[in-house]
């Protein structure tokens, strides 16, 4: 018999965390007219997925672009592992190139001896390319008071952890990044080629036209790798085709080109950010007395000012939509970063 429920909440597994957190605060200098305080904290955490409930081999936290990339938890791994399909390689560690398309073959399911796909499906062939969890997080700050003036700042940092930039994936496929100028012309490394009457491309280095007067293009490239039989790849692609097909939406042919790869959309997310700066002044006590106040403090404050260092420069990952740790690991449809500057007056009575 049924109970009329469509879903239920249950403890689905066991997670082990091992970490350390510390905070320090102290005055480095103190005199009649000056006081300097420093503060800082950091935390380290390592987690391991010990087990999942019977019958569950993998817990999917986020399924991106029809399975092209996933954020998962797998027993023996860490919560937040990022997995995706990767190009196939042979026993010599060389990329295998599809003999028809000229693109890297993606490791979906099975291929025959000639390198032709037997089945395009969602087999368990995705590989770990990152993890969403930072290794170390923390910050430090300083407060310096000299007579009636003060300056206070906060710097925070995050070390390790990865983000999946879906927006960057699509923009790279559309040729919107400076790096996609590569191969677009001869100056940027593009190969010269022409296309014959059968649609086959041939290298034409130094030629002004093909044998039959064909037009010469200078946006060619040959992907590194070998064909399934071990011969070097010699298939010429145009730069536009390469970016569009390699970095488009989706992975398996039913949901994309079948040549897309998402490992390039995974970026290290280590940063040091100048979070806040306040500069202020305590008004003279005589002025506060006239206004019937015990004290009056005015300050100019700036928040989310700038990065001192960061490894991921496409977008500000802190502007991602959603506040959960999963949302913070996916850059997609985010708003622009904001820097705020304000003026405050604080009075005590």
Predicted regions and their residues:
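Membrane-interface anchoring segments and C-terminal beta-barrel signals
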Residues: 214-349
